[in-house]
Amino acid sequence: MAGSFAELARQADKSRDTMLVPKTALETPPLEIHTLGDEVLRQPARRIGKVNEQVRELARDMLRSMYTAKGIGLAAPQVGIHQQLLVIDLDLENAATPPLVLINPEITAASAGLDTYEEGCLSIPGVYLDVVRPTAIELSFRDEMGRPRKMKADGLMARCIQHEMDHLNGVLFVDRVTDQDGLQKELKEKGFERQDVRSVA
């Protein structure tokens, strides 16, 4: 698909190799991933002013924690850090493919066409429900070296970016679920409280 992760990775320049970390589970991840009900997930993230080695090391620790949890995306608020930073890797099987690091991302355009697809979240483990989102997006962001970038994405990449960007605004995917009966059932089965959902659907 256009804007696929493999295509984006091929277009990236070699400096992104600085973000490569082993795509394996650690016995103890460096960062704790907060779960639904933790108020930290509901606080909006702040823009990052200066992109430096501290920011890059945070991104690496987020990746290590994400790989340990077997996820494909993670936003800084999920680990209790209210900065506009997210990491994505849709190619977990290929150790040489660099992950995508988005700093201060902004969606500049979204398709009129919508798509329904099942989503899950490391902050709501075990819960999987359909969410409607734009099929394709355009966005601007800074990369891990602080350089301004623009990008087009569709399919799973577009969905993953939108899902992770929601976290920067204190929104979780369950807030966008329209099937309230299914939502109630899934949350109850996995030990979460319906009252912790803040519907925006």
Curated annotation (Swiss-Prot):
Signal peptide: none
Pfam families documented for this protein: Pep_deformylase
EC number annotated for this UniProt entry: 3.5.1.88
Active site residues of this protein: E164
CDD domains linked: Pep_deformylase
Database matches in InterPro entries: Peptide_deformylase, Peptide_deformylase_sf
Keyword hit for Hydrolase: yes
Catalytic reactions on record: N-terminal N-formyl-L-methionyl-[peptide] + H2O = N-terminal L-methionyl-[peptide] + formate
Record bears the keyword Repeat: no
Amino-acid positions noted as binding Fe cation in the UniProt annotation, renumbered to this chain: C121, H163, H167
Superkingdom of source: Bacteria
Cofactor: Fe(2+)
Cofactor detail note: Binds 1 Fe(2+) ion.
Molecular function via GO: metal ion binding; peptide deformylase activity
SUPFAM superfamilies for the chain: Peptide deformylase
Enzyme class: hydrolase
Gene3D superfamilies (UniProt xref): Peptide deformylase (3.90.45.10)
Matches recorded under HAMAP family: Pep_deformylase
Family of the protein in this entry: Belongs to the polypeptide deformylase family.
Biological function: Removes the formyl group from the N-terminal Met of newly synthesized proteins. Requires at least a dipeptide for an efficient rate of reaction. N-terminal L-methionine is a prerequisite for activity but the enzyme has broad specificity at other positions.
Name the record gives this protein: Peptide deformylase
Originating species: Synechococcus sp. (strain CC9605)
Gene, per the UniProt record: def
